From Swiss-Prot:
Gene: CYP71B16
Residues annotated as transmembrane: 1-21
Organism ancestry: Eukaryota, Viridiplantae, Streptophyta, Embryophyta, Tracheophyta
Native species: Arabidopsis thaliana
UniProt keyword Iron present: yes
Coiled coil: none
Protein name: Cytochrome P450 71B16
Protein family (similarity comment): Belongs to the cytochrome P450 family.
Chain residues that bind heme: 444
Amino acid sequence: MAISLLCLFLITLVSLIFVVKKIKHSKWDLPPSPPTFPVIGNLHQVGELPHRSFQRLAERTGHVMLLHFGFVPVTVISSREAAEEVLRTHDLKCCTRPKLVGSRLISRGFKDISFTPYGEEWRERRKFLVRELFCFKKVQYFGYIVEEECNLLVKKLTESAVGRPPVDLSKSLFWLAASILFRIAFGQSFHDNKFIDEDKIDELIFETETAQASFTCSDFFPIAGLGWLADWISGKHRWLNNVFFKLDALFQRVIDDHSDPGRWKDHKDIVDVMLDVMHKQGKDDSLRLTIDHIKGFLTNIIIAGIDTGALTMIWAMTELARNPELMKNVQGEIRDSFGNNKERITKEDLNKVPFLNMVIKETFRLHPVAPLLLPRETMTHIKVQGYDIPPKRRILVNTWAIGRDPTLWINPEEFNPERFINNPVDYRGQHFELLPFGSGRRICPGMGLGITIVELGLLNLLYFFDWRAPDGMTHKDIDTEEAGILTVVKKVPLKLVPVRVQ
């Protein structure tokens, strides 16, 4: 305790000296800020759900708002117009990433796609990953895996429906997304994999996301190593390293398995491709891969891929279960389109259900998987809504707040897919009131695959089954309480009773 108090005193003392030296009239017309405390700035105003805290602060301060996290200024964007200026008008000037402690560790020194600062190396890595995994041709090819895994889920749910017990749909949909991504990336079924513990993988993914988005004193008090000392005393470094080692052990087992010449595989997966490139590359090749690069890529593919699919399906089914008439309407569209005797849903069926697509859009609006886009950092001075944002400043775009802006959406807290009837707004990065995948150079490269998983998953759930609340509950008892930082999960798992439709 004495050491912690001494550390806090030293941070405060050095910080106050730093502030006094920095006080001067700024030449910039900076965005407005809410009142701050000495040393900590606005950190005391950030709750367990930062996107909600930022929305409340923006309502009082402005949609372009300057916060201070310790000694680090952060601009928070909460309007469509400001988001368009950041992500389109000034995209090239602010498309790099800040170098944060958690993201540096999990990305193995920025050897991934998501957290690597902008530059030639990042462009080459992204180009490679899109070509080998996320381009339209690859997504179409991997469609058979999505179909097969959805079919397996239908069979399991059909077996569960015999006695009509409630099913943990949150876990079932997580496993569906994980099974698809593991087969695509690793060439093996999630359930049959000998080195993956099904009961612990969701915990590892949640821990990894928390590590990537965690607030550390090292990030916000970068003065004389005192922030690092505070993290060491609090156990933050130990926890981050523990998450890293667990994730690293998983990916090392994957790589070792792929290095076995006798391994059976049903297709050449992305790990095979990356290992081939690594073994055959020349010193003059524009793309240089090491084992750390491969592990960094796998972190992006698995973590982001599973979340996009699983969480979107969970939130969509949550909202439909809370609105029985709405569920009946979307099921009516699907069953009228497909008839009563369809045995299997395929990717060719995706363009036959426009109302389901509206349900997905509305889910993205009300429950974006990433409520705050990954932080950007300005490389040069820019102006947003008339305010100056100097170089080396972090920017957060609050897509969750934009999706609930009453100036853009009528009754924004209401789940109403019909708002998208005759509405051209789409989620592919060109309409800045709906940004589940971001926009510009940093738009999510796996958007196409993620959408395919969501569409086919929901189609199977809604065509083959009716859904009821568990005994003792009604649809009004199903809540939407959130948890998480980098991504937002349903805090209480969604449990529903499947009724197989004959």
